Design a protein with these regions (language model features):
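Ligand-binding "clamshell"
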Residues: 25, 243-256
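Short, well-ordered beta-strand elements
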Residues: 25-33, 75, 85-88, 107-110, ...
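Append "and occasionally in soluble cytosolic enzymes with long acidic Gly/Pro-rich linkers
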Residues: 197, 275-337
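Aromatic- and charge-enriched surface segment that lines or borders ligand/interaction sites
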Residues: 75-120, 136, 142, 225, ...
Length: 337
């Protein structure tokens, strides 16, 4: 067994919004990455969630923009005193896009599928602690855990835990059917995915009638598309060096947020000289994380102190333990011999 010590950098995400988008009932959203397929429960690709999460598919809970957790398909829940039982009450009147009813049986199917022995869910480890999923009645489902897990509600908000209908699984990678505010319409691979408003949505009706996701991988083409206003929004704009120009242009808004993306530089602590803790501490103090962020991402990023992004409930800021200090680094190397 070996141990890993890492340099951690949190990656910021920039979204550009054209002012003209605010007065339309349709929107064109540009993304750099195209999904490999459209089943968020069977691949690690974040590009799937970028298009489908909360738009087409929903989970029992969901993320807000600040990383907090709010009810999704579950309107409420109760947690037993020992932390082993979660009882979820589902919203009544929820239907899938094919008109069939979403109920506790669909929740059981989805979670059992995610945690099954043969599951290909990219986050399967998050759900293996669920020992049993029991349908109490059509609107009530009970989860029993093998041990308490304070992150369960957070884990259930991931795109990997969205609720799907058993009948839709065969074609889910090409024609996804969910419960969200938008329905899948069309996918022109290499170009775009089109969604339309779900008029039978159980929640607040969306203001938009149509949403188109365009895939533009080349930074130069991305810049040109924004400047020509061919797109209304570019989420995760791939060329941060262009952001000051957009910020100075009254046609656009630039929004900076956080992502689950971390840049991690790791070393093998079992091999000399890295098996010496003083050498590892010296390396940590020799690296200017902010300078890397400034150079590689033009300042759009955050030095982080754990393996989690700052909005994750498990995040602990330990950056003070490895602050950039060349003199201290040299002294530690001298002590290490």
């Amino acid at each position: 067994m070996f141990h890993i010590r890492s340099l951690l950098l949190g990656v910021a995400s920039a979204a550009l919004i054209a002012g003209s988008a605010l007065a339309k009932d349709d929107i064109v959203v540009a993304l750099q990455l195209e999904p490999p397929h459209l089943d968020p429960t069977s691949a690690a690709a974040g590009a799937i969630d970028s298009v489908l999460y909360s738009n087409v598919f929903e989970g029992l809970t969901r993320f807000m923009g600040d990383g907090s957790i709010v009810p999704g398909l579950a309107e409420s829940w109760e947690i037993s005193d020992d932390g082993l039982t979660y009882t979820f009450k589902l919203h009544d009147g929820v239907t899938f896009h094919d008109g069939t009813t979403m109920d506790a049986e669909d929740v059981k199917f989805s979670l059992d599928r995610a945690r099954a022995e043969d599951s290909v869910n990219a986050q399967k480890a998050l759900y293996t602690g669920i020992a049993n999923v029991e349908v109490i009645d059509p609107l009530t489902v009970k989860l029993t855990l093998s041990e308490p897990n304070g992150s369960l509600l957070f884990n259930l908000a991931w795109g990997d835990a969205v609720i799907v209908a058993p009948e839709s699984i065969e074609n889910i990678k090409q024609t996804p059917i969910g419960t969200g505010a938008f329905k899948f319409v069309n996918w022109v691979q290499g170009d775009k995915i089109e969604l339309e408003r779900n008029d039978a949505y159980w929640g607040d009706a969306p203001a938009l009638a149509k949403a188109t996701f365009k895939f533009i991988s080349d930074p130069t083409a991305a810049f040109a598309a924004v400047m020509a206003e061919d797109v209304d929004v570019f989420a995760g704009f791939p060329a941060p060096e262009n952001l000051p120009q957009f910020e100075a242009d009254p046609r656009f808004q630039v929004l900076i947020g956080s992502t689950e993306g971390e840049t991690i530089l790791s070393i093998n602590n079992a091999l000399p000289p890295f098996d010496n803790v003083k050498v590892r501490e010296a390396i940590a103090h020799a690296i200017d994380r902010q300078a890397i962020i400034d150079g590689a991402m033009f300042g759009y990023g955050t030095p982080i102190g754990t393996f989690f992004a700052p909005h994750n409930p498990a995040y602990v800021d330990l950056t003070s333990l490895s602050e950039y200090d060349p003199e201290k680094s040299r002294a530690l190397l001298a002590e290490a011999g």
